[in-house]
Amino acid sequence: MKKERAGNVSAKRSPKLSTTATLRAHARHKIEKGAVTEGYTADRTKVVKMLNDALATEIVCMLRYKRHYFMATGVHAEAVAAEFLEHANQEVEHADAIAKRIVQLGGEPDFSPDTLVKRSHAEYVPGKSLMDMVKEDLIAERIAIDSYKEMITAIGDDDSTTRRMIEWILAVEEEHADDLAGLLDAGH
């Protein structure tokens, strides 16, 4: 009796795999949808909106980092400015990945300057001193970290490609926060 139950449990865990013919037929059906197949279960409209807000966040963060890169002055400014530039370039990579995913989902990436700050989770705060700049960037990274964690939870298993992309971005944002916290601790 126990063997029978064990067999049933493992059978329940194993998803039924489609035949090659079925996979091929599904791929040909609604081909105009591109990467979005019948197995996609997320609400695309909501995911695209979340991604456009994340896109705005990445662009605003890039702009702030670029300003801080050019405005950094003081004894340790060169090393801190290099960190700002590295982060700015990584934010551009994130924005590009997000925009590409939006298009894959059949949406349009919103690069409108008129609404960037309004849609961004993080604020654009210029900062006056080098220490202010580091603090503002750290605050923005902490906001991004929380918003990406919420997005990952909201998406769940409904869109694994988008979730993995956001998890990758989240890992980089956490590195940014660690870098900036280290600069604060060092008193730059």
Name each model-derived stretch:
Residues M1-H188:
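Iron-associated oxidoreductase/ferritin-like identity signal
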